[in-house]
A protein has these predicted regions:
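N-terminal targeting leaders characterized by basic, low-complexity, disordered sequences
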Residues: 1-15
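Plant regulatory low-complexity segments
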Residues: 11-20, 88, 93
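PPIase-associated folding chaperone regions across multiple families
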Residues: 15-45, 52-63, 183-277, 323-398, ...
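N-terminal targeting/tethering segments
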Residues: 59-196
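Sec/Tat-exported extracytoplasmic proteins
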Residues: 84, 88-91, 136, 140, ...
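Surface-exposed intrinsically disordered loops and tails
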Residues: 104-121, 284-300, 313-315, 325-337, ...
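Peptidyl-prolyl cis-trans isomerase
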Residues: 274-332, 367, 402-448, 482-483, ...
């Protein structure tokens, strides 16, 4: 083949696309283009994946999506998280170590709720989520009511809320958190920050103010309060009784269970009746003419114990003082009838396994005025074993006397006492309100404190009393008697009426409010 012919062939091949070099060049160009396309697409996918990961791991989903809608308000997962955690913390603080009785181990914290079964089904996480939703519905209904009624937070109330949240900076630093946001997120859930917590706190304060405003509209006459208290039929009265329980012999049945039968229960009743007869005999004697007369001044508890001993029965009577009528058990109906000191009877136990010999000592129907007092608590310092030594108590007394002297040498008024209480008192329950307890009931405080409250003092009377609570504290109270409050019976009845009316009012407010859970509710908890 001539050179010219070969040249023409190559030219024709190029024109038709069949030249091998051209084909190779075109294939290389195509591969490069394909490679560039793959690289570009891969890069886009990687970038999108990175963005998705960052998005999911950020707070955006928790702050910008909707987890719950109530009426015209939407709540983000972060906002629900705060209420969810708050429900758990409030519950844990209320029940403390008793939470274990309900099957909850609070030591595992929020993270452990999803792995603990709730007794009625589901998990404890489910329980607290529903509690949070219920609370949010109520708060939403109340704050809507507040807006409709023109109830707003005052500048002072707003400042108080801001002051409380301002303290979070120091708390966060003290506990080693980089910021308040980190503190809140770690303890309340992802996305929870200062804004979320502040708004929830503000909302709660407004709701409380609205509830208080409603309660202030409730008024009850003395007749209404007395009628309400009498409707309890002695359930809220306090009783002082002494009893001895005669247990019937338990007989084993064919299935291995043990229980009293008619014969053994009858035998127990005979013993109880013998003790009762001996008790009654100890209460009478004969006068000079041979007539039976009651023995005056007998101690009821000692009398019952003497009767038990006379009958050759082992054991002693048990005294239950300051017990409400509703807690008396099998003999409550007998005790709540008209009784005099020393009355006694035999009552079968409701379980059919024995009977009581019970004697009546006294009954308090709560028709006494509540005490209003101020105090300054100076606590003794416990040693390493938790013991309050005489030296520690003496030091506390000396400090209490110093504070008392400071008050006496000053203006010596109720106002100056209140100021010293806020300055010196170690009672966290009253040292922010001048040491005031304005509705003290009998038996509510430690013994010496209680005795001061109900010793017939006049307004302005003062003194120092010792106080000690098992497992709590030991120390001295500088006391200031303010005066008498309302009757305890009226206080009990009024609180009951207010609680009932408030619940009915709240039920009417939340009627029509529903919570709609969104897709992102799954992020809660």
């Amino acid at each position: 083949m001539s050179a010219s012919t070969e040249k023409k062939r190559r030219q024709a091949a190029r024109e038709t696309g069949t030249d091998r070099k051209q084909q190779a060049a075109e294939r290389l160009a195509a591969e490069k283009a394909k490679s560039r396309f793959k690289w570009t697409l891969g890069t886009v996918l990687v970038v999108l994946l990175i963005v998705a990961i960052l998005f999911l791991n950020s707070n955006v989903l928790f702050k910008s999506t909707t987890a719950l809608t109530i009426g015209d308000t939407s709540y983000s997962p972060a906002e629900v998280n705060y209420r969810y955690a708050s429900q758990f913390y409030n519950w844990a603080n209320t029940y403390g170590s008793y939470a274990a009785m309900f099957g909850l181990d609070t030591s595992k914290g929020l993270a452990g709720l999803a792995n603990q079964e709730y007794p009625d089904g589901g998990t404890w996480a489910d329980f607290f989520k529903e509690e949070a939703v219920t609370a949010m519905i109520q708060t939403k209904a109340i704050t809507d009511y507040a807006k409709a009624e023109g109830i707003e937070l005052s500048a002072e109330e707003e400042a108080d809320i801001e002051a409380e949240f301002a303290e979070l900076d120091a708390i966060a630093q003290q506990q080693g958190y980089a910021s308040v946001a980190n503190l809140l997120a770690m303890n309340y859930g992802t996305g929870v920050n200062e804004d979320v917590a502040f708004e929830a706190g503000r909302e709660s304060v407004l709701a409380s103010k609205a509830v208080s405003a409603y309660i202030d509209t409730l008024e009850y006459s003395a007749e209404e309060l007395e009628e309400k208290y009498q409707s309890y039929n002695g359930d809220n009265d306090y009783f002082d009784v002494v009893y001895y329980y005669v247990a019937a012999e338990l007989v084993e049945a064919e299935d291995g269970s043990k229980a009293a039968n008619e014969e053994t229960l009858a035998a127990a009743r005979v013993t109880a009746e013998e003790i009762l007869a001996a008790y009654e005999a100890l209460g009478v004697t004969e006068d000079e003419e041979g007539n039976e007369v009651a023995v005056e001044g007998l101690d009821v508890e000692q009398r019952l114990n003497d009767a038990i001993a006379q009958c050759g029965v082992e054991g002693t009577a048990i005294r239950t003082a300051k017990v409400t009528g509703s807690s008396l058990g099998a003999y409550q109906e007998w005790a709540k009838a008209e009784r005099s000191e020393g009355d006694a009877t035999v009552v079968d136990n409701s379980n059919g396994n024995g009977c009581y010999v019970v004697a009546f000592i006294s009954r308090d129907d709560n028709h006494y005025p509540l005490a209003q007092v101020r105090h300054i608590l100076v606590m003794a310092e416990a040693d390493a074993e938790g013991v309050y030594t005489d030296e520690a108590k003496a030091a506390a007394l000396a400090r209490a006397e110093e504070i008392y002297a400071e008050w006496q040498n000053g203006e010596a008024t109720e106002e100056s006492f209140a100021a010293l209480a806020e300055q010196y008192s170690e009672d966290g329950g009253s040292n922010t309100n001048g040491g005031l307890y304005d509705n003290v009931m009998k038996g509510q405080m430690v013994e010496e404190f209680d005795e001061f409250c109900f010793a017939g003092h006049e307004s302005g009377d003062t003194g120092i009393v010792y106080g000690e609570a098992m497992g709590g504290y030991a120390g001295y109270h500088v006391m200031y008697y303010v005066g008498e409050g309302q009757l305890a019976s009226d206080y009990i009845a009024e609180n009951d009426l207010i609680n009932t009316a408030s619940q009915e009012w709240l039920d009417s407010l939340v009627e029509g409010y529903e919570a709609e859970k969104g897709f992102f509710f799954k992020l809660v908890g």
